[in-house]
Amino acid sequence: MWLEWLVAWSWSLDGLRDCIATGIQSVRDCDGTAVITVACLLVLFVWYCYHVGREQPRPHVSVNSLLQGVDANGLQNGSMYCQSPECVRCTHHDGLNQKLYHNLQEYAKRYSWSGMGRIHKGIREQGRYLSSQPSIQKPEVFFLPDLPTTPYFPRDAQKHDVELLERNFQAILCEFEALYKAFSNCSLPQGWKVNSTPSGEWFTFDFVSQGVCVPRNCRKCPRTYRLLGSLRTCIGNNVFGNACISVLSPGTVITEHYGPTNIRIRCHLGLKTPNGCELVVGGEPQCWAEGRCLLFDDSFLHTSFHEGSAEDGPRVVFMVDLWHPNVAAAERQALDFIFAPGR
């Protein structure tokens, strides 16, 4: 009936008037159920338009930029006190999940969706995972679901790399001591970075910073650099991978903070570990030992401090990020792609 009426209808003002009159009469003739149904459909349509409008793509957000920050004094930080609007620890980026999902789709198109279930789930429900995590563990960029959780890992979690690092303890220590001779009271030697702390001084000498090699520093420590290339589980191709020498001066306290992800294990090889130095992860304190590796999940709330005297000298560790042992090979490849530096 309606189809015949539309075909026969004259496209004119008179026809428009007749159309409106017919529509009003049709509504009057309808029973209450039909009117309610139409009203519900109209509400659903309006809600859908609003929802689609809210999810229009945000401006491009580089994953790498979310991990970087500079404080008010221009000192690179990476943990706290950063005031950069691009720092993930200081601001929330609504566009990040969309960017990650786009990267995952691009990876799956090139390779395969096989084995991507946890990553897909993690990206899709990232906001819920991060907001529902207990306050003791809150990775600030990416949470991979269904990974075993513990503040500290046993040494055999990455046995090969731990043993290799410990066998090369003396070589790394010698290269550090050669570097440290350049320190003076008035200037920071080239290649070193100072990090913001509420008290004391914290310096790092980067070999890999957020997945990017630092060639000038690597050339100064060739044996340490070659050692990094021999590690089987070193994260070197995405923004969650770092390797450096970390120095805490006496009297230094690092503010409690969370790392960006739970897909990695942070490994500290003790180079110089005077008394009064401690690492606290998830409320559990541990002490470093020279020539020994300490493995922990830095997505837990953690801090470090050096309460020794000036005569004790600095606390020095060689730090490197290793893959969490329960992240599968296919997932590692995909995460390297999704979180590639500069992507």
Curated annotation (Swiss-Prot):
Q: Any keyword Oxidoreductase?
A: yes
InterPro entries the record matches: Asp/Arg/Pro-Hydrxlase, Asp/Asn_beta-hydroxylase, IPNS-like_sf
The superkingdom of the source organism is Eukaryota
At which positions is Fe cation bound? 257, 302
SUPFAM superfamilies, sorted: Clavaminate synthase-like
Query: What is its subcellular localisation?
Result: Membrane
* Keyword tags: Dioxygenase, Glycoprotein, Iron, Membrane, Metal-binding, Oxidoreductase, Signal-anchor, Transmembrane, Transmembrane helix
Main EC class the enzyme belongs to? oxidoreductase
Q: What is its EC number?
A: 1.14.11.-
Q: Does the keyword Oxidoreductase apply?
A: yes
Pfam families in the cross-refs = Asp_Arg_Hydrox
Predominantly, its location class is membrane
The Gene Ontology terms for molecular function here are: dioxygenase activity; metal ion binding
**Segments on the Lumenal side according to the record's topology features:** 53-343
Cellular component GO terms, alphabetical: membrane
* Residues carrying sugar: 77, 185
User: Topology versus the membrane, per the UniProt entry?
Assistant: Single-pass type II membrane protein
Co-factor(s): Fe cation
Q: For binding 2-oxoglutarate, which residues are annotated in this chain's numbering? A: 202, 246, 266-268, 315
Positions of transmembrane segments: 32-52
Q: Which residues lie on this side of the membrane: Cytoplasmic?
A: 1-31
Annotated function = May function as 2-oxoglutarate-dependent dioxygenase.
Q: Which family does it belong to?
A: Belongs to the aspartyl/asparaginyl beta-hydroxylase family.
The protein's name is Aspartate beta-hydroxylase domain-containing protein 2
Specify the species: Rattus norvegicus
Q: What is the lineage of its organism?
A: Eukaryota, Metazoa, Chordata, Craniata, Vertebrata
